Amino acid sequence: MMILQVILEGIGLGVLLVIVCAIGIRKGAVGMVHLYSPEVQDRCVTLRLTTREKIKRNALVFKAVCVPGYIAYVLVCVYAVNGARGFLAGFWQLLVILSVMNLMDRFLVDDYWVGHTNAWTIPGTEDLKPYITTKDKVKKWLFGTVGMAVISAVLAAIMMIFVR
């Protein structure tokens, strides 16, 4: 039953990601333009929808809030809630949680929400669609698989120092 719990925790992290995205685009998708290609960002600046400074600030805030928040979430789930001890127990749980979130990001956010709805459309940039190109998708899938495994291994190794 532990695997079911860990999958549910991954879904919880995916829901947090969706909430963060929904908050980010609540006043229009330009609020999350830092996640778009440089071409879309340039167009938004040219159209005076935003400034380079706002894009940089939003990207920094996104990273400063989300990365530590996601790390805290997975560590609390794996070590405080699930009671993982040792490298392997921590690693597999971290990997499953992050992988489930990654799948939700790829399919629910990228493919469906960004690719098939107008919620992420920025007026004046429609000719630059698809916003997530095949090349972008390949990078995201590569990072989402290899990257999540590396992050899980690093976090599990660090946590071995603190949790016995």
Task: Set out the residue ranges of the language-model regions.
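Juxtamembrane boundary at the C-terminal end of a transmembrane helix
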Residues: L155-R164
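Hydrophobic alpha-helical membrane-embedded segments
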Residues: I7-G31, I97-W113
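Short membrane-interface loop/juxtamembrane segments of multi-pass integral membrane proteins
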Residues: Q41-I55, T121-K139
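Juxtamembrane non-transmembrane "cap" segments at the membrane-aqueous interface
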Residues: R106-E126
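Interfacial segments of alpha-helical transmembrane regions
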Residues: E9, G83-V100
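Core segments of transmembrane alpha-helices
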Residues: A59-Y79, K140-V154
